[in-house]
Amino acid sequence: MPGKEENDTLEKSLKELNLTSDEMTKFEKAFKDPEFIKLFEEYAKEVSDPKVKAETDAYLRQIEQQGRAEDVYGAGTQLIVPDPAGAVIKTKVVSSSASKKQQQEQEKQEKEQQQQAAGAGKPEGPGKQGALPVGQKVFINICTCDKLERYSLTDAQDPATGRLRPKLTIPLSLGPVRQGADKQGAPAAVYDFVVHPDSWTFAAGNAAGLATLADTALDHVEQVGRCRLVRAWKRLNCRYKGTEGAAEPPVQCIRTSAAAAAGAAGEGAGGRVRPRPDVPGVPDLPGAKTAPPAAAGAAATAAAAAGAAEGGAGSSSRSTFSFDKSRKAGGTEAAGAVAKQEATITDPARPGYRHPDGAVTPEWGLLHRGEADLGEAWGDAGKGLAAGGRVPKELVVRVTLPDVSSAAPVDLDVGARCLALTVPNRYRLSVQLPYGVDDAKGRAKFDKARKVLEVTLPVVPPPAPPPGAAAAARAGLALIQELGGSEEAAEVKAEVEVEVADVMGRDQEAAHAKSEAGAGAGVKSPHTAAAASSGAAPAPAAASEEEEEEDKEDGGPAAGSGGDPAAAAAAAGASSGRELTENERKWRELHARQQQEEQEQQEAAEAAAAAAAAAAEPSSRSQLTGTVAQGGAAAAAESVAAAKQQVQQQPVAAAAAPTAVLRPRLNRELAMELD
């Protein structure tokens, strides 16, 4: 709890602000409230917190990097990011330029000037920096920045002698004083003195140049601090003298002549620029850095010289904020351009469209939010996730409302496929949604810092397909496809018949070969008779048994089918225990028909071979009998050989050297899978 003396001090300070009676009553009542005093102390600590200062400096660096200093702080404003040059000057205050009585008179004059400015409607800027106490140490950091103008060395006429002498001009920027400490922990004043890199290179190259640069820095510190410094300065062996929360030089803000042309001259040399009220938030614009104006360096030099001539604020005074609102004159042309652009917009949903009642369509965006399974692309880095054709889970509508401080005046209406937003006399928006949404489960959130309203609407899932559709989809993905009565099906059937005819032709050739073998078997040679007496079966019979076994394995005609292919196919389907498809039934009929034809051809070939053998046997016997009677066993052997040669010359049994015929067997299951 603050004591009585502290309360009296606060009341006295409030009286010095020259407030109205109503404002004074509110302040006195507020400062008597312990809760308000507690909050005020927390605010003061937060403002003076080094972390907060570091965040502010980082924000200014971001603005400078993006090249948006003029957009945020007004025309003619430049942000300077100093870079330590590696030189620190140490000196001490030997005397103050004003006594205590003179300081009181000066403060009184400043107060009168502030009252006059308030009466004239001008902003009230902060007072000048107080004089540095005697004996306090002062550290001046020499820094560089390429945004300042480089030095110039010209010949100028000396007013005293009238002779031409070299004149060195060094454009500079002096930052505000910061409270630091020396090695012993005693309070010390710290300044940042910024020049162009070429100016520092020129000064560091010779002793005279360095002395001139140091004297220039001391002169400006004396003008700002209203004191006298020891000229016997000392250069420290360190890169930079920092303070608490500022290990690096903080960002400085300077004003150029363009600021006065834009109507910001009312801030004067003692005020710091403030952010423009018409720039909502800090949008993310990476890579938007622009080059500084060509006349910025010269204008900065002129501003620095003018500040030095005024004797109260060099360029350091330009780093404090003020509350000037006289920036309306420079915005007339921009407002006209914006109005012209709004007049050319004819789409009500396009941002910037002005409705008949004066409302404007705000900036807005529509996002599709969904879910994806990373397992779909697992193990294949180049596969990716297919996003097309998927219905999103949610629709997100983001609307930027820069002139709205809360969600209270916003009227939001959401339908099944539309969204309407209205802010009376300010904004109006109507959006058609690409998907149906569940308005009862939607949610909205307003970000006061960014002035953005975010509306999240869950998408109504599509209706489930009928039960038969899933089976049809699975059937469409199968390898077997039913063939209809189209022309393509007829062409496929013709191709299958041609392939079957080729197979049948090869089977007929094999049947001729078998008939030859049967004809040869009809004339029993001594070797054949020996094989028969030993009980060995002939080779063709064995081959036929193997073929019958293969036919049984392949699902040939069933017993009792009567040779009907359709009946055989039906019997095969009944044996499998399931109903055959049209394609399977056709394949089974074709296979059964092929086996039936093969069997008929084989039987015909065997009958022909038997008939030929029966016709050749009587003639061979008669010839053999006559030969035996005439010439004995030798002549009989020759007759048997001649008869055998005659049998081989028959047209039915004519064949070349014995060859092995490999006939491909049709596998029904494989053929149906490859169809």
Curated annotation (Swiss-Prot):
Q: Does the keyword Manganese apply?
A: no
Locations listed in the record: Cytoplasm
- Positions of the UniProt region annotated as Disordered: 98-131, 265-293, 310-340, 509-659
Gene inactivation phenotype reads:
Paralyzed flagella, leading to a loss of motility. Electron microscopy image averages show that a density is missing from the inner dynein arms region in axonemes, which probably accounts for the paralyzed phenotype.
Q: What coarse category fits the chief subcellular location reported for this protein? A: cytoplasm
In the record, biological process GO terms are: axonemal dynein complex assembly; cilium movement involved in cell motility; outer dynein arm assembly
InterPro entries, alphabetically? Kintoun (IPR034727), PIH1/Kintoun_subfamily (IPR050734), PIH1_N (IPR012981), PIH1D1/2/3_CS-like (IPR041442)
Biased composition (Low complexity) is annotated at 279-293, 529-543, 564-577, 604-617, 628-659
Q: Where is the composition biased (Basic and acidic residues)?
A: 102-113, 579-596
Q: One GO cellular component term, please give it.
A: cytoplasm
Q: In what ranges is there compositional bias, type Acidic residues?
A: 544-553
Q: Which UniProt keywords apply?
A: Cytoplasm
Function of the protein: Required for cytoplasmic pre-assembly of axonemal dyneins, thereby playing a central role in motility in cilia and flagella. Involved in pre-assembly of dynein arm complexes in the cytoplasm before intraflagellar transport loads them for the ciliary compartment.
Q: Which family does it belong to?
A: Belongs to the PIH1 family. Kintoun subfamily.
Name by which UniProt lists this protein: Protein kintoun
Q: Which organism is it from?
A: Chlamydomonas reinhardtii (Chlamydomonas smithii)
